[in-house]
């Protein structure tokens, strides 16, 4: 999707000598590098809450140092970051939501259910709340709520009950412990479909640890506030919960505010934004496999 993201942002960045683009999830710097190479006059602000990723992107983007500003922050802070830099608005914003393959591959960070690791899952290692904080302290009801809402897991109550039992017995110390608890909580017929049975619970705990959906809900309206006239916002979402939020915010932003029954649409009621295309586009099989 990298080339497609660059193409979608292109109309806002082409033939501009003063355009600023925000890569709100700069990660390893791949999308940022593609944008900087394609549009030699733009300046880029790269934001990431993951310090490890930010340092790697610094290396990736070292040839563009004079045009790049890297910030350790969450993307809901975009307006404050721009104000600090003296920037009133930007021509483009790119979001690549969810977890990265780099984070999954670093087994010690606890994002993977296939390798024994501490119960961490923090994207920002300086945050105080980890997966262990949640798993060891949340009530059964709160655990079930998180797993059901953020993992869309129909066996959430049973999983939560078994987590509480395991922690009381001192048998919940690692990611593989959690994965085994989840597996034992799901009936055998249900385990045979949908991939690893721990996937949904790990997603749910990770989202709760990092407050991913709450931050996204705050960030998108703020992104709309700082985008310039004829600017573009591109969002890559990976799962249905993110996708739902993005579609809801964009649908509201592109809707006329004209009262029902008014014979004509007044200028002040017109939508301030329009969708570049309706619906969504799908990554190819290779990228989907890498993201998993």
What kind of region is each of these model predictions?
Residues 1-292:
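S-adenosyl-L-methionine-dependent methyltransferase catalytic core, i.e., the SAM/SAH-binding region
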């Amino acid at each position: 999707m990298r080339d497609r993201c660059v193409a979608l942002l292109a109309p806002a960045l082409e033939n501009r000598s003063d355009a600023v683009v925000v890569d709100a999830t700069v990660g390893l710097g791949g999308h940022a590098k593609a944008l900087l190479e394609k549009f030699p006059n733009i300046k880029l602000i790269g934001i990431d809450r993951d310090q490890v990723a930010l340092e790697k992107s610094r290396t990736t983007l070292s040839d563009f140092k004079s045009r790049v500003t890297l910030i350790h922050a969450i993307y809901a802070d975009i307006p404050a970051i721009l104000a600090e830099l003296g920037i009133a608005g930007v021509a483009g914003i790119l979001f690549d939501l969810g977890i990265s393959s780099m984070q999954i591959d670093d087994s010690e960070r606890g994002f993977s259910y296939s390798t024994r690791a501490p119960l961490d899952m923090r994207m920002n290692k300086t945050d105080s709340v980890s997966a262990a904080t949640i798993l060891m302290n949340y009530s059964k009801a709160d655990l079930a709520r998180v797993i059901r809402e953020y993992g869309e897991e129909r066996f959430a109550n049973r999983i939560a009950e078994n987590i509480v039992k395991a922690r009381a017995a001192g048998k919940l110390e690692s990611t593989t412990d959690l994965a085994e608890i989840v597996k034992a909580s799901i009936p055998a017929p249900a385990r045979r479909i949908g991939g690893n049975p721990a996937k949904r619970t790990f997603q749910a705990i990770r989202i709760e640890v990092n407050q991913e959906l709450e931050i996204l809900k705050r960030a998108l309206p703020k992104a709309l506030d700082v985008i310039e006239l004829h600017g573009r916002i591109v969002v890559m979402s990976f799962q249905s919960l993110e996708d739902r939020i993005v579609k809801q915010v964009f649908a509201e932003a592109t809707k006329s505010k004209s009262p029902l029954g008014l014979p004509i649409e007044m200028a002040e009621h017109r939508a301030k934004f329009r969708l570049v295309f309706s619906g969504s586009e799908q990554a190819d099989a290779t990228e989907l496999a890498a993201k998993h």
